Amino acid sequence: STIALWLHEAGVAEANARKRPRKSYKRWARDKVDELWQLDGFVYRLFDTPHTQITIYQLVDDASRFDLGSQAFAAKENGFDARTTLAAAIETYGRPQELLTDNGEAFATYHRGRLSDTERWLAAQGIWSIAGFGPQTQGKDERSHQTMTKFLDARQPTTLQHVQQLLDDYRE
């Protein structure tokens, strides 16, 4: 923290040897827009009486962190809704070189010895599908989800259509 840094500089406190200095961290991000998009889905509960669960797909450009098109669906995470989200973004912004996803059934299954429908669809589009096995990908999607969830929670949507309108507003 800043206070710990000031105390260390003043010679009043010892630096915590167990922590690496922040300046030693290497930021992992692509250099150019459309080199890599990241797609991830997460469950969101509506503010209706049964607390209906929906799935929100968030698609983000890795270099710019621009939200390319978040969409909400009533079904659990699946390849069809993921491809719908991707197709809308590709129609608007063009194709990325690569798409990074988690290892969910809807996205990347090649490491299990088979290709998902989404992976085959991406290959037909000329897009490389990659899955995030390394720690360098951790946190980006989750941080974006956290910000989006706070935005939605503050507005307490009760319907899928209301969530989609809020997602469109969030992107603007």
Positions of PLM-derived features:
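Basic, flexible linker segments flanking DNA-binding modules
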Residues: 1-39, 44-45, 116, 135
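Charged alpha-helix within mobile-element recombinases
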Residues: 117-172
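Active-site beta-loop-alpha junctions of metal-dependent nucleic acid enzymes
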Residues: 52-55, 70-98
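An active-site-proximal beta-strand-loop segment
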Residues: 39-68, 76-79
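Short, solvent-exposed loop/turn segments at secondary-structure boundaries
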Residues: 50, 71-72, 108-113
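Mobile genetic element proteins and their domesticated derivatives, centered on retroelements
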Residues: 3, 40, 59, 65, ...
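An acidic- and aromatic-residue-enriched active-site/binding cleft used to recognize and process polar
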Residues: 62, 72-75, 104, 127, ...
